[in-house]
Amino acid sequence: MIYPDRFDVIVIGGGHAGTEACLAAARMGCKTLLLSHNIETLGQMSCNPAIGGIGKSHLVKEIDALGGAMALATDKGGIQFRVLNARKGPAVRATRAQADRILYKAAIRHTLENQPNLWIFQQAVDDLIVEQDQVRGVVTQMGLKFMADQVVLTAGTFLGGLIHIGLENYSGGRAGDPPSIALSRRLRELPLRVDRLKTGTPPRIDARTVNFDLLEKQWGDEPRPVMSVRGNRAMQPPQICCYITHTNERTHEVIRNNLDRSPMYSGVIEGIGPRYCPSIEDKIHRFADKDSHQVFIEPEGLTTHELYPNGISTSLPFDVQLQIVRSMRGFENAHILRPGYAIEYDFFNPQDLQHSLETRVIGGLFFAGQINGTTGYEEAGAQGLLAGINAALRAQGKAAWCPTRDQAYMGVLVDDLITLGTKEPYRMFTSRAEYRLLLREDNADLRLTEKGRELGLIGDEQWQLFCEKREQIALEQQRLKSTWIQAGSAEAEQIEAKINVRLAREYSLMDLLKRPELNYADVASLKGEPLAGEAAAEQVEIEAKYAGYIDRQQDDINRLRAYENTLIPEDLDYAQVEGLSNEVKQKLSAARPQTLARAARISGITPAAISLVLVYLKKRGLLKRLKDDHPVPEQQAG
């Protein structure tokens, strides 16, 4: 039967991508349906119980700046918070939170169930309804049809999922969940490039069988960082300690002696695994000169004894896993609660997508998350949010939107995927962003919340908080610029004691704040009242100290903006562009970049090649530029 109600947007899958996608579309006013094979697993953390980290927390805070759920759920479920790279510059600082799986999932579930315009239904999807290269709806396992002209697919590792433990394997989406076989077959019928990737997870340990006296303790930071602009320390649950142990030569010997029983090294697994989160057998093989590897022992929650040993992901047979675990200090008598495993799954070449994450071949069909070749909750959530936004915009007959590389890490993520593609699971790092000094985690709201409000993503409460913070920053910057300290004054003596230099002339408080020896607290209270808000005060200090660098980076962006705004006709015949090598012609024809800037980022495309294309466009009268706030041009809704 056909379900009697029609929807604007249907989202398939209730993981980190799916939840952000359906929430975004619903916040924008679209009648949205979330379909999941099991609503008890909505927002489940399938792998490690943590959110954030280097590069990843930037994505979390950008999701939050656009009204998403991940950061606030982390504050409600986070049982240890730390700032990574705290001694380095603000561009690479990152917040990481250990999360209670149950509390995090409950926070996501509560958000979903209380979101207006959002309906939830428990059924796996087996088929898509496609008419004349346009998606029209989906068919569930029970034959029930739901109709919508926008469908967001966020199937994670479930498409053709195959779980490996040793040389044995069986079908599964993750441990305890069935795979999506029928949907995988259906998608393979579409003119999309598909391949296989793999990821893995470590065995889980019973804390009652671990000798913690032998482990190094790792406490969180105090004062605790807060992940969401809507969050606070009062909502964070009780905090716990994590621990550190190490592999040793005995561990490595066990692994080396059993590599022939590894599905990775025996050729059973075809998919490529994540480079930056390798299995323990991969570490031993690739870094043969190292006699030890760090293992972080992460509690799974406040009400469970289950431990997650971060650093020993493995698909070796269970008897080998037991030897590996018990070879480590403190784990001599450890009991494994769940075995580690690897999972192989389908992913689709992201170069077959537009920057809106809509497929190029099927109108209204959007992909987000691991099926686009990424790894990580944060990468999935960011894509889900953007896919949900663009599905809603399409339903409303509006042009698609995607932030550019100088606006957000989300823009870097999507642009890398669509322009360069990926052969291995893609993980975000700060090093991937050429404008990272502008794309700090501390200013995500200042970069994106105004756009989020324009799109209909931001509620009144978050908007008010944002406006107050922005006003506080502006007023305080003006106060610091207009407040002066005279040489020889009592205030000058306070400053001289800290910088060991005599002030020979008058300085504004802003000038003093730019000095590396002084922080905001040192100068703000010399005259007048300092800001009470930590986030606003931090912003004032960072913008003062890095003003010169920030201005230079902005100049670089302005110079490149001409390329960013120069459109390439969708049907341009690169074979007609004189001077281009055959290799360059093939790459440009395959990628179909929408702007010269995106063409320039394709591997192997030289500045000379870009100049030839630019000259060709000028000669043929094809030179066109984006006129407004450089949105990404996409196929109009239809």
Curated annotation (Swiss-Prot):
Q: What are the binding positions for NAD(+) in this chain?
A: 273-287
Which family is annotated? Belongs to the MnmG family.
Task: Respond yes or no to whether keyword Ribonucleoprotein is given for this record.
Answer: no
Transmembrane annotation, as ranges? none
Recorded GO terms, molecular function? Answer: flavin adenine dinucleotide binding
Kindly state which keywords UniProt assigns to this record, in alphabetical order: Cytoplasm, FAD, Flavoprotein, NAD, tRNA processing
Instruction: Name where it mostly resides.
Output: cytoplasm
Under the subunit heading, UniProt states: Homodimer. Heterotetramer of two MnmE and two MnmG subunits.
Q: Which organism is it from?
A: Cellvibrio japonicus (strain Ueda107)
Classification via HAMAP family? MnmG_GidA
**Protein's name in the database:** tRNA uridine 5-carboxymethylaminomethyl modification enzyme MnmG
Q: Which cofactor does it need?
A: FAD
Q: Which SUPFAM superfamilies match?
A: FAD/NAD(P)-binding domain
